[in-house]
Design a protein with these regions (language model features):
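A beta-strand edge to alpha-helix "cap/lid" segment located at domain peripheries
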Residues: 1-27, 37-130
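ATP/adenylate-binding site constellation spanning eukaryotic-like Ser/Thr protein kinases
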Residues: 33
């Protein structure tokens, strides 16, 4: 039985999480659309293109130690060759000797390109921890 579009999108997001959690950021570029945009929290800037977006993971992982990361199942809506997914997460990390605990939602837009679902847009929205 072939995977549904939602299952394929879920697998693409799981692949992204696995890559950054394992520090394998070199593999992330292949998961991103060539014109990908990551909008910074609060819409306070943006990273454009694969190289710049992968660098956001590299910078975070170089500067911090992730102590805990949990995410919920994503909510996925598919419209032809476009999908919108939201993913709730909670994380604790140390940066510069200071601990932070945060929670929020990642919002992704994915496009089907050559039979693969690629991340084309992402932002993060902070939310209170549960």
């Amino acid at each position: 039985m072939p995977e549904s579009d939602s299952q394929q999108v879920r697998a693409a997001l799981a692949g992204l999480t696995a890559a950054w959690r394992k520090g394998k950021t070199a593999s992330i570029g292949a998961m991103l659309h060539p014109s990908v945009v990551f909008v910074h929290p609060g819409f306070a800037g943006r990273a454009e293109g694969r190289t710049a977006c992968v660098a956001t993971y590299d910078e975070f992982l170089r500067a911090s130690i992730v102590l805990r990361y949990e995410e919920k199942e994503p909510s996925i809506d598919v419209f032809g060759d476009t999908a919108v997914a939201t993913l709730r997460w909670e994380m604790a990390w140390e940066m510069g000797g200071q601990r932070s605990d945060d929670a929020g939602h990642d919002v992704y837009v994915l496009v089907r390109d050559g039979g693969r679902w690629l991340i084309a847009w992402r932002t993060l929205i902070s939310a209170p921890p549960t």
